[in-house]
């Protein structure tokens, strides 16, 4: 049982082409953290569309799908705007078939719906992050998720930098392989890092320096130039002694930013 990203050479990990899914229930972790308008209409479905090759391959192979994802960063247990129920209609349209929905990702309802799935059927679970155990990579929570299926597929490249229960914990309990999107992204990164064209420039953005420490430290040794963008650029500006006013800044990470600048 092995996860695609945690440990070892990613190029040697199994993909969905390496397993037989006929008649099996497959837990599929995807990244459907898509934007919505005020009426909760999806304004950009790119992340959903990019998973279709994986989902259709599994369905054509005779699998039943249990799809898991998160939306946003819920600060309360059940904020409606973060519910995956807002994805059901569009996902059904993309797949051309009915999509069942569970109002929780674990527990009696999810277990009953998952157990009753037949080959070719699809179940979408409620937001994983409604449970704090997801981000904590809680073993008991991961085991509950894994118990819904026979095998798991990780196609959520967008969250692969996080060791959460659904992507890092589940593989400890059931066999987990990479989906086509995950495989494509990892192969692209490996190819780029192994034999890059020069000059090699990396553009890294986001709000938090703390989320990118490992990436930046690793990239410093491989690239010619790193361009820092997004909110975390202000933390680096502060580290260089530049005025940033009231701009977003991780004050407790300024010393760390200084260390990274010195390393560069």
Describe each PLM feature range:
Residues 1-10:
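Short, Lys/Arg-enriched N-terminal segments with co-localized hydrophobic residues
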């Amino acid at each position: 049982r092995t996860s695609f990203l945690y440990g070892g050479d990613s190029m040697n990990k199994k993909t969905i082409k390496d397993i037989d899914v006929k008649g099996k229930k497959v837990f599929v972790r995807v990244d459907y953290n898509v934007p919505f308008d005020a009426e909760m209409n999806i304004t950009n479905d790119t992340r959903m569309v990019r998973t279709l090759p994986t989902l259709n391959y599994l369905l054509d192979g005779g699998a039943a799908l249990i799809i898991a994802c998160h939306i946003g960063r819920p600060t309360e247990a059940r904020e409606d705007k973060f519910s995956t129920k807002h994805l059901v209609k569009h996902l059904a349209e993309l797949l051309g078939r009915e999509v069942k929905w569970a109002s929780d990702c674990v527990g009696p309802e999810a277990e009953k719906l998952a157990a009753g799935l037949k080959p070719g059927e699809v179940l979408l679970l409620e937001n994983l992050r409604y449970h704090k155990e997801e981000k904590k990579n809680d073993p008991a929570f991961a085991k509950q998720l894994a118990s819904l299926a026979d095998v798991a597929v990780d196609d959520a490249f967008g969250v692969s930098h996080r060791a959460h229960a659904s992507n890092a914990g589940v593989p400890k309990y059931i066999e987990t392989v990479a989906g086509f999107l995950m495989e494509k992204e990892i192969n692209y990164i490996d190819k780029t890092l192994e034999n890059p064209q020069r000059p090699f420039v990396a553009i890294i953005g986001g709000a938090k320096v703390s989320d990118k420490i490992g990436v930046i430290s690793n990239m410093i040794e491989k690239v010619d130039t790193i361009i820092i963008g997004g909110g975390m650029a202000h933390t680096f500006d502060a580290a260089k002694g530049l005025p940033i006013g009231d701009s977003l800044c991780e004050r407790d990470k300024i010393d760390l930013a200084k260390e990274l600048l010195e390393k560069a």
